[in-house]
């Protein structure tokens, strides 16, 4: 793999990057806010591809947990691009992406992200769970915390006497997403499926009678 495109829209800030096999970014763009992602992400990918002017061998995309709309938009774009270009597609979880920011971290990394209904999604050891702010689990084991809800979680852990490091990583850098895919490729592991990882089930429901009326 020589160049990997990366697409992320799991959290409030979305981003796209083109990253070389040695890990350096040849293009990187961000867009703030979730509204309008369907309209803004595809042209942003085209802009990044044009600026990089390289042959991309794979595309990586964050698959969650995170925003329903953001995940669906990013995954659909990545799937379409990979299929059209005939290249590999790598799914990358949110905690995998954040872990790429701290290659020398010698303690577990908890990823805390804000969720609907005043909750926090907490990802520990690859498992994501939803908690009310007051119900964040305590630990006396050394941990580090990242994500857009890291401040709240780190404060509660510290107040309970925990050994906690509050990292400076709040949003995902798409370069980390590419790094995770590159690491998986270099380790000889197959790509993770680019299917959304949800903590809550999607709220959309089919009508009880189906999408079409019964024939008469």
Where are these regions (language model features)?
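Oxyanion-binding and handling regions
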Residues: 1-25, 34-39, 90-216
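N-terminal phosphate-binding loop and adjacent alpha-helix
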Residues: 32-48
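Phosphate/pyrophosphate-binding loops at sites that engage ATP/ADP/AMP, CoA/4′-phosphopantetheine
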Residues: 45-58, 136-140
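DPxDG-like acidic metal-binding loop motif
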Residues: 58-89, 94
């Amino acid at each position: 793999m020589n160049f990997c495109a990366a697409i992320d829209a799991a959290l409030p800030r979305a981003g796209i990057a083109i990253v070389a096999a040695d890990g350096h970014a040849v293009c990187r763009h961000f867009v703030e806010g979730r509204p309008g992602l369907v309209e803004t992400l595809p042209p942003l990918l085209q802009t990044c591809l044009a600026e990089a002017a390289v042959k991309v061998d794979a595309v990586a995309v964050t698959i969650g947990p995170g925003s329903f709309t953001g995940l669906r938009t990013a995954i659909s774009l990545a799937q379409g691009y990979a299929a059209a270009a005939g290249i590999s597609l790598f799914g990358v979880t949110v905690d995998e992406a954040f872990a790429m920011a701290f290659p020398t971290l010698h303690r577990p990394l908890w990823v805390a992200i804000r969720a609907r209904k005043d909750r926090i999604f907490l990802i520990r050891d690859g498992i994501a769970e939803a908690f009310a702010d007051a119900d964040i689990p305590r630990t006396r084991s050394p941990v580090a915390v990242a994500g857009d809800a890291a401040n709240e979680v780190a404060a509660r852990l510290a107040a309970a006497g925990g050994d906690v490091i509050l990292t400076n990583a709040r949003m995902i850098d798409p370069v980390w997403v590419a790094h995770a895919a590159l690491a998986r490729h270099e380790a000889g592991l197959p790509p993770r499926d680019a299917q959304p990882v949800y903590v809550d089930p999607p709220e959309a429901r089919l009508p009880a009678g189906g999408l079409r009326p019964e024939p008469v």
